[in-house]
UniProtKB/Swiss-Prot annotation:
Coiled coil: none annotated. Glycans are attached at residues 267, 370. It comes from Mus musculus. It comes from the Eukaryota. This is GPI-anchor transamidase component PIGS. It is found in: Endoplasmic reticulum membrane.
Length: 555
């Protein structure tokens, strides 16, 4: 009986050891991998090497320039060398991680018969009408006509002319270094019509040191897929003024043609409103000498905040909102004039705020007070008002007057208020700005994901990152080839995809789940099971060691 009991006890011990080993094996070989897999943070692979390479991206902006030489514009020996191509390239000195080079590829050729006929006319406008084929010119390309040194096409004191389309005229020269001298003039004209250091600096204003560029460079709106424009009439004294404005007709006549030309750069929506009893919030100063009131330049920033609370919130808008306010001062503060920094009245009686909009003060003619009872009817001169608002709108979009070379005649804008090469120059700037924004966004996202390991990277986020990187590379390649339209479209796609990835809500799912909270959750679950298994394994290990140390047999 004792032997049977000992055998049963040994069998139970062996069974216990096997059970402990089985539980330990299941926990280690199956439980731990399953727990690790089900609790890991999913992170889809990203092109980190491609993103880091974007910091050293070289943007080569190529402007195709066709140079057409008429008879007697250069010496005969030089005319026999035509056609040929000359490339002028220079680096833009900006303190920015992305290198930018402007490349003017000048294709020289002789003028065709119809071009010779057009350029022999009496005025440059007649020649432009005869040469007008803007639909055949690609976006971003330029055509420069070189005429005879003694041609009457331009005024005698003018050496060059910049037209409203993608064309310019430059006087030739009978000189042995004619090509070199004329080539420098052509580059100056081409830069004024396309890419200058100021244009690119304004586009990269948010990415450059603040002390390098003035506030004027930060005036243009940031690139966006759309913009909202609101025209507001502020009538603080409706008891004295019955103001009428034909804003709908003025928008259709003046603003809409301008926005139609700008539609390639974004979508636009326009609305209007009338606000009564809306005050500026700043007390104007009375001038006894002129019996008028004035707003000093230093007080203008304080005008916007009180008025902005009445305009409606723009926080709900997906796009930037531009406000254009027409303020009719109350009778007690009429007439009201805006002063510049020297204390002189501003000619337009208006001012604008960068990336916000503009305000114009519209004074009522004092003669109507004598002939009418209050409230007097006020008919707003919308032509004068829209001239001011359109000028402000151009500045807010970064469409400023170009820095033309000396003795250069600049044509006025067309009826739409925008020249074709100005639109191209805007697209150049927007493309560079979009690429800089997309590169910064992707780099910041890669750094963030590298520092915080428990951020989830879903497949759709990774696909947006890949799409953004590919779009940046595509846009850079298109810019180097001079394909402005496709480059701008690719740059917009790069910004959209990069920001969609950066602001994806799924990135925040496990962001606030640190390691100490993980231990606080998992220890109560696994400790009661792990302690008995570990103790059993220790006991089995100790008994196994004892069994290996058998006592030596003594005779």
């Amino acid at each position: 009986m004792a032997a049977a009991g000992a055998a049963a006890t040994d069998l139970e011990v062996v069974r216990g050891k096997r059970s402990a080993l089985f539980f330990a094996a299941v926990a280690i070989l199956l439980g731990l991998p399953l727990w690790w897999k089900t609790t890991e943070t999913y992170r889809a692979p990203l092109p980190y090497s491609d993103i880091s390479g974007l910091n050293a991206l070289l943007l080569r902006l190529m402007v195709p320039v066709t140079v057409v030489f008429t008879r007697d514009s250069v010496p005969l020996d030089d005319q026999e060398k035509l056609p040929f191509t000359v490339v002028h390239e220079r680096e833009i000195p900006l303190k920015y991680k992305m290198k930018i080079k402007c490349r003017f590829q000048k294709a020289y050729r002789r003028a065709l018969e119809h071009e010779e006929e057009a350029l022999s006319l009496g005025s440059v406008h007649e020649a432009e009408a005869m040469l007008a084929e803007p639909e055949k010119q690609a976006e971003g390309s330029l055509t420069v006509y070189v005429i005879s040194e003694h041609s009457s096409l331009l005024p005698q004191d003018m050496m060059s002319y910049i037209g409203p389309e993608r064309t310019a005229v430059v006087r030739g020269l009978i000189h042995r270094e004619a090509f070199n001298i004329i080539g420098r003039r052509i580059v100056q004209v081409a830069q004024a019509m396309s890419l200058t250091e100021d244009v690119l600096a304004a586009a990269l204003a948010d990415h450059l040191p603040e002390d390098k560029w003035s506030s004027d460079k930060r005036r243009p709106l940031k690139s966006s897929l759309g913009y909202e424009i609101t025209f507001s009439l502020l009538n603080p004294d409706p008891k004295s003024h019955d103001v009428h404005w034909d804003i709908e007709g003025a928008v259709q006549r003046f603003v809409q043609p301008f926005l139609n030309r700008l539609s390639v750069a974004g979508n636009f929506s326009v609305d209007s409103q009338i606000l009564y009893y809306a005050m500026l919030g700043v007390n104007p100063r009375f001038d006894p000498a002129s019996s008028s009131y004035s707003l000093a330049m230093h007080s203008l920033p304080h005008v916007i905040n009180p008025v902005e609370s009445r305009l409606g919130s723009s926080a709900a808008s997906l796009y930037p909102v531009l406000h254009f306010l027409l303020y009719v001062p109350e009778l007690a503060h009429s007439p009201l004039y805006i002063q510049d920094k020297d204390g002189a009245p501003v000619a337009t009686n208006a001012f604008h705020s960068p990336r916000w909009g503009g305000i114009m003060v519209y004074n009522v003619d004092p003669k109507i007070y004598n002939a009418s009872e209050l409230p007097v009817r006020v008919e707003v001169d919308m032509v004068r008002v829209m001239e001011v608002f359109l000028a402000q709108l151009r500045l807010l979009f970064g469409i400023a007057q170009p820095q033309v070379p000396p003795k250069c005649l600049l044509s006025g804008p067309k009826s739409e208020g925008l020249m074709t090469w100005e639109l191209d120059r805007l697209l150049w700037a927007r493309s560079v700005e979009n690429l800089a924004t997309a590169t910064t966004t992707l780099t910041s996202l890669a750094q963030l994901l590298g520092k915080i390991s428990n951020i989830v990277i879903k497949d759709d986020v990774a696909s947006e990152v890949y799409r953004a990187v590919a779009a940046v590379q595509k846009a850079a390649k298109a810019l180097a080839l001079g394909h402005l339209s496709s480059a701008f479209a690719a740059s917009q796609e790069a910004v959209t995809s990069s920001e969609r990835a950066f602001f994806d809500p799924s990135l925040l799912h496990l962001l606030y789940f640190p390691d100490d909270q993980k231990f606080a959750i998992y220890i109560p679950l696994f400790l009661p099971m792990a302690v008995p298994i570990l103790l059993s394994l220790v006991k089995i290990f100790q008994e196994t060691r004892k069994s290996w140390k058998k006592p030596e047999k003594i005779d």
